Structure formats: C-alpha cells, structure tokens
Amino acid sequence: MGFLKILRKQRAREREMRILILGLDNAGKTTLMKKFLDEPTDTIEPTLGFDIKTVHFKDFQLNLWDVGGQKSLRSYWKNYFESTDALIWVVDSSDRERLTQCSEELKKLLQEERLSGASLLVLANKSDLPGAIDVNSIAQVLELQSIKTHHWKIFSCCALSGERLVQAMTWLCDDVGSRIFILD
C-alpha cells in the first residue's frame, strides 16, 4: 500500500478539514463564521490576528480559521497556509471601490504553493444590500473562469441572515471530502 493511500485512510478516520477564511477587511468573514456556528452576530469587532473555531457539519469536523483582513495583517496570511484543505474567500459585494483590490489579493493567494489543491469557495457577501454587485459580475472581475489550479465555486450570500451559507458550506465539504477522504 502506497504512502498516499495510508495518509488518506488515516484522514478518513479523522474526517477533519482545515478551512481558512480570508478576505479584505470588513467583508464579513467573522460574521459569516459566527452565523454558521449559530453564535450571536450583534457585536462583531474587527479580527486582529486570527480566531479558530471547530464545528461538526456533514459528518466532518471543520476547523475554521478566521484571519483578519486589514492591510497591515495581509503579509501574515502566509503563516496560516500550511495543511489548508479549503479557502473561503469573502467578498463584500457592496464595495465596488475595492473589488479590483480584492481580485489582486485573491490572485496572490492562488499562486501560493502551500494552498495548491485547496478548494476555493468564494462568498459574495452582503448581497442583500442596495447596489450590491451580482455574483456573475463578481466572478468576472475575480476572473474565476481562468482558475485551473483549484476547484472553485461562488455563492452570493448574506452573513446576517445566513442566506445560502449552508448550501455553500455543503458544496465545500462535498468537494474537499471527495478529494481527500475515502467516502463511505
């Protein structure tokens, strides 16, 4: 039995995923994580550094790493890449002025060797706000169709209501699970 098969069998028993949540500041990363964990979202502070939460979802243990998105913290993102199974990239779909910056940061991340093979879930958050950019336009600006190095999918969502969050996380778990675990 090859080494890779042994590793896959070990991970199959653990059924654990490491998920990194990144995006520009004020995109809604922490609110999305708290909503998914069914925690209160009425008092959210900017994440200075990182926060780790663990939740069981779809027979998996998800270790969610919420990392601050302020410009001064982005150079530290690379410290969290190791052993990442999936990347959730959160976009503020109401922030037209920073969409190009958002695209540039995502492109840098996708070039990182330690993130190679990680599934990419793009969450176009704040889709409920007036003037929010539609998901197809966001996909176009982010040039998602050109991504060949990662499995990816984009969902519009609303962190405050939780709209489409379970659907998005289900896709992510199914995608990662089909690649790195021996499914029953």
UniProtKB/Swiss-Prot annotation:
One of its GO terms (cellular component) is centrosome. InterPro entries: Arl2 (IPR045873), ARL2/3 (IPR044612), P-loop_NTPase (IPR027417), Small_GTP-bd (IPR005225), Small_GTPase_ARF/SAR (IPR006689). One of its GO terms (biological process) is female genitalia development. Its main location: cytoplasm. It is found in: Cytoplasm; Cell membrane; Cytoplasm, Cytoskeleton, Microtubule organizing center, Centrosome. NCBIfam families: small_GTP. GTP-binding protein that functions in embryogenesis, cytokinesis, germline development and microtubulule cytoskeleton dynamics. Belongs to the small GTPase superfamily. Arf family. This is ADP-ribosylation factor-like protein 2. It comes from Caenorhabditis briggsae.
